[in-house]
């Protein structure tokens, strides 16, 4: 069986690696080709070393509570290369009226779970705190249809909870506008909490007590006895993950700087993949591990409905600005993992990670590495500036918010145009329609962050599922 994977990001690498595993497990030889338009693998993952600093241009970690990336690391034999967060500083700040306020202890993304930290918090007004408490009394929603995250938080917890916490935290994950973001597609557990417990605060409180009793310390048990922090990364940065996956693929199976221009089927039912240099490759199956809008472009002549559905998934652009400083140049104690910036603050940045505090080995002694996030669905206009302008803007914001009083030792700007899928209300229905259309094209599969999860672990799951489904499809065709 010949398999072509288009796209060398995490989803494509996971798909290719899983195909190699399944080939070995089932004794079915596979001729694997992975095509990537760029001159490197990894997609948005890119790690750089500079002057003793370890710079993550893209994702700096993955969630351990989603098991797929950890499970893959275990199969790869690199679990001992994983690094936990430094939990001495496990807290987040929120910018309010130009100052950094700690997120109250026990606040779980959308709602509080502890009474006293909320009461004493300087982040919320008293009317805002009382409005959040009304969640304990409000009835559950009767309409079971999809709802935006913004509408859900306003309804259950009030506008202040949305503007001060939910919106900036969600922006840090999805770079999205919460008034368009589908709750069912992004945070379905909160929908389930309302259905089963009525009150989100009560449901979170019960869950936190259960977790504290069974695990403790804010760590995740992966089922093998190991306990991980919520976020984990690699000793040498996330690109180590990419290198390990690439090294496990068959020699000569990866084609870099190879742009695919079209995917179609021939009269015999084989798949044809055309490249910009005029090559035509044939395969029994194809996995498109690209952005949805790229997949739509490649399939334009195959199926009129499928590209239309794929282009209905919007994307947002973003950028990261990494800045290195001497420790004495920053007045703030940096006693947390970073801060988020609510949109109501009207600032040109959406968040900042204290990279060298969050993980060890990211900066030389007596130095600090900070990473500022810009753009997203609510503030894409800021990205119109050049790299120098973005770096200067990020530095000015750190001067105001952290008391920085010296120029950075260096800056590194990384841009990600149309790279973050936006899970708007109705997203799951769109994905189901896409999957329905794929059923008309045996041997064609999609993978990546556009469909059922945007994180690294989600992309691993998506790629591995595509490979498994392709093997099942091929076996079914052989037996029919």
Would you name each region that the model predicts?
Residues 1-11:
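Beta1/beta-strand and adjacent pyrophosphate-binding region of the FAD-binding site
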Residues 3-5, 32, 444:
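Conserved hydrophobic helix-helix packing surfaces used for dimerization/oligomerization
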Residues 11, 40, 293:
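Conserved Rossmann-like nucleotide-cofactor binding loop
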Residues 20-50:
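Glycine-rich FAD pyrophosphate-binding loop
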Residues 44, 104-106, 333-336, 350-480:
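Conserved flavin/dinucleotide-binding core of flavoenzymes
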Residues 51-140:
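Dinucleotide-binding Rossmann-like beta1-alpha1 core, especially the glycine-rich loop
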Residues 88-91, 111, 115, 128-262:
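Active-site/ligand-binding neighborhood in enzyme catalytic cores
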Residues 256-370, 375-384, 388, 396, ...:
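Mid-domain catalytic core of redox enzymes
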């Amino acid at each position: 069986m010949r398999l072509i994977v288009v796209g060398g990001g995490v989803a494509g690498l996971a798909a290719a690696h899983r195909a190699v595993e399944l080939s070995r497990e089932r004794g079915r030889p596979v001729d694997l080709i992975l095509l990537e338009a760029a001159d490197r693998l990894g997609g948005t993952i890119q790690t750089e070393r500079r002057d003793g600093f370890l710079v993550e241009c893209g994702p700096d970690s993955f969630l351990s509570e989603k098991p797929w990336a950890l499970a893959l690391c275990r199969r790869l034999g690199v679990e001992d290369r994983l690094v936990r967060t430094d939990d001495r500083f496990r807290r987040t700040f929120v910018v309010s009226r130009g100052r950094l306020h700690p997120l109250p202890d026990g606040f779980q993304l959308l709602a509080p779970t502890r009474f006293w930290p909320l009461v004493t918090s300087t982040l919320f007004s008293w009317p805002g705190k009382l409005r959040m408490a009304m969640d304990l009394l409000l009835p559950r929603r009767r309409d079971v249809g999809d709802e935006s995250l913004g509408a859900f938080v306003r309804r259950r917890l009030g506008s202040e909870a949305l503007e001060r916490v939910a919106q900036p935290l969600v922006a840090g994950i999805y770079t999205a506008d919460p008034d368009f973001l589908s709750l069912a597609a992004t945070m379905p557990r909160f929908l389930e909490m309302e259905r089963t417990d009525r009150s989100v605060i009560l449901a979170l409180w019960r869950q936190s007590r259960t977790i504290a009793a069974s695990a403790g310390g804010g760590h995740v048990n992966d089922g093998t006895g190991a306990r991980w922090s919520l976020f984990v990364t690699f000793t040498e940065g996330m690109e180590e993950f990419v290198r390990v996956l690439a090294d496990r693929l068959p020699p000569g199976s990866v084609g870099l700087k190879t742009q695919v221009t079209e995917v179609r089927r021939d009269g015999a039912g084989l798949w044809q993949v055309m490249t910009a240099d005029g090559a035509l490759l044939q395969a029994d199956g194809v996995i498109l591990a690209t952005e949805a809008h790229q997949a739509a472009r490649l399939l334009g002549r195959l199926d009129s409905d499928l590209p239309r559905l794929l282009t209905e998934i919007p994307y947002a652009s973003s950028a990261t600005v990494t800045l290195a400083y001497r420790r004495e140049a920053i007045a703030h104690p940096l006693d947390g993992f970073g801060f988020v910036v609510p949109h109501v603050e009207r600032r040109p940045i959406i968040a900042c990670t204290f990279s060298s505090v969050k993980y060890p080995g990211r900066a030389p002694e007596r130095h600090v590495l900070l990473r500022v996030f810009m753009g997203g669905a609510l503030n894409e206009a800021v990205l119109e500036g050049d790299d120098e302008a973005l770096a200067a803007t990020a530095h000015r914001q750190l001067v105001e918010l952290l008391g920085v009083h010296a120029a950075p030792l260096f800056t590194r700007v990384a841009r990600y145009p149309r790279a973050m899928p936006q899970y708007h209300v109705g997203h799951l229905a769109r994905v189901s329609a896409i999957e329905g259309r794929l059923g008309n094209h045996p041997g064609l599969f999609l993978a990546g962050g556009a469909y059922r999860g945007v994180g690294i672990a989600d992309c691993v799951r998506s790629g591995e599922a595509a490979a498994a489904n392709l093997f099942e499809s091929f076996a079914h065709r052989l037996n029919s």
